[in-house]
């Protein structure tokens, strides 16, 4: 199933006049296991570059950095054997780099402050890339295929796949079934308590 990332910030864009190397940041948390298939930075005139990071626990890894020119918006497609395979709960972080100076020929007048908006003279900050949602079984299968494709050996680090190093993971390790059962038990307990209270009345 196709998965869009909803990764960006259209409210807090504050680009100061006549200043280069300004940064914008946005985060999202993956609600399902995903295999990322594309990276598509979308900025406006001051945009110079965008980087995408994956954060899993205390592990932070840069997945992609790409230059940006608003005259030619590009989509970058990951090769199948390098596409990031990320577990549910991974934090995705994008950083946008802005140049609001005369050195940036796309900016009509760098003396002006710039905020958010849909016009080219205002700004957007979005990763429009997409991915594929993975079930628990598909997630484990994708990691095993990646290990075989790169001739993985114990101790090897796999860029963009924080759990690939654990070749003994099972569905129970990556599944939410235990959490769902616990939630169901809690709901049943609440219902039983309510029924008992009603009977006592």
Sequence positions of predicted segments:
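Ser/Thr-rich, Pro/Gly/Ala-heavy low-complexity intrinsically disordered linkers and tails
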Residues: 179-200
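Beta-strand-centric surfaces of beta-sandwich/beta-rich domains
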Residues: 1-173
């Amino acid at each position: 199933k196709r998965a869009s990332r909803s990764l960006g910030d259209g409210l807090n864009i504050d680009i100061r006049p006549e200043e280069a190397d300004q940064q914008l940041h946005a985060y999202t948390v993956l609600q399902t296991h995903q295999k990322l298939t594309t990276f598509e930075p979308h900025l406006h005139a001051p945009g110079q570059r965008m980087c995408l990071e994956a954060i899993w626990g205390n592990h932070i890894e840069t997945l992609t950095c790409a230059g940006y020119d608003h005259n030619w918006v590009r989509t970058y497609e990951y090769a199948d054997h390098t596409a990031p395979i990320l577990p549910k709960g991974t934090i995705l972080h994008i950083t946008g780099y802005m140049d609001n100076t005369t050195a940036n020929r796309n900016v009509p007048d760098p003396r002006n402050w710039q905020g958010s908006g849909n016009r080219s003279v205002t700004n957007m900050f979005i990763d429009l890339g997409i991915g594929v949602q993975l079930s628990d079984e598909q997630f484990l299968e994708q990691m095993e295929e990646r290990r075989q494709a790169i001739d993985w050996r114990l101790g090897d680090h796999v860029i963009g796949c924080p759990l690939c190093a654990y070749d003994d993971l099972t569905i129970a390790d990556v599944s939410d079934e235990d959490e769902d059962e616990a939630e169901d038990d809690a709901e049943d307990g609440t219902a039983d308590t309510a029924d008992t209270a009603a009977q006592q009345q």
